[in-house]
Amino acid sequence: GDNILKVDSFLTHQVDFSLMREIGKVFAEKFASAGITKVVTIEASGIAPAVFTAEALNVPMIFAKKAKNITMNEGILTAQVYSFTKQVTSTVSIAGKFLSPEDKVLIIDDFLANGQAAKGLIQIIEQAGATVEAIGIVIEKSFQDGRDLLEKAGYPVLSLAR
């Protein structure tokens, strides 16, 4: 279809680590003054840019896990995320022990389309009482409304390609 971008050679399947390291440095520089304490993403393709961003900021990186149905353990924070690409709703989760009210979080993800993944991560982070400082996106599908949704909700969005 017209809405598909092929990025499997460097981002979503094979990872170009030197490119990811540069991406991490760019996000780290942009958000250097924000006092970021954690980088949060969603599995799987957000992990590479997020880990290099966290490395450049020298903070931990947490990735939300996707599961169709999750056995609710104590202290697990969850949100529902609808994927327009796969047309399926997933439960995403992060163990609450990894986020605290003192945390200032930078969300990093590979794509921004409709903003549903970021919205789910924001819900989880806010359940923990932590603050979302900004959202960094490798590739924004600017013909979709994700940025609008997130900025209207008060979250700064930086995308490296749109």
Swiss-Prot record:
Tell me which residues bind xanthine. 5, 12, 141
GO-annotated cellular components = cytoplasm
Please indicate which superkingdom the organism of origin belongs to: Bacteria
Identify the pathway.
Purine metabolism; XMP biosynthesis via salvage pathway; XMP from xanthine: step 1/1
Q: Which GO terms describe its biological process?
A: purine ribonucleoside salvage; xanthine metabolic process; XMP salvage
**What does the entry list as the binding residues for 5-phospho-alpha-D-ribose 1-diphosphate?**
113-117
Recorded E.C. number(s)? 2.4.2.22
Q: Name one Pfam family in it.
A: Pribosyltran
InterPro entries in the record: PRibTrfase_dom, PRTase-like, Pur/Pyrimidine_PRTase, Xanthine_PRibTrfase
Keyword entries, A-Z: Cytoplasm, Glycosyltransferase, Purine salvage, Transferase
So what does mutating residue 51 to I actually do? In strain: 12261
Substrates-to-products reaction catalysed: XMP + diphosphate = xanthine + 5-phospho-alpha-D-ribose 1-diphosphate
Q: Which residues form a coiled coil?
A: none
Give the location in the cell: Cytoplasm
Q: Impact of mutating residue 131 to K?
A: In strain: 12261
Stored CDD domains: PRTases_typeI
Q: What's an example of a GO molecular-function annotation for this chain?
A: xanthine phosphoribosyltransferase activity
User: What NCBIfam families does the record tag this protein with?
Assistant: PRK09219.1, XPRTase
Q: Which family does it belong to?
A: Belongs to the purine/pyrimidine phosphoribosyltransferase family. Xpt subfamily.
What is the purpose of this protein? Converts the preformed base xanthine, a product of nucleic acid breakdown, to xanthosine 5'-monophosphate (XMP), so it can be reused for RNA or DNA synthesis.
Q: Fill in the subunit field for this protein.
A: Homodimer.
What is the protein's name according to its record?
Answer: Xanthine phosphoribosyltransferase
| Species of the source | Streptococcus mitis
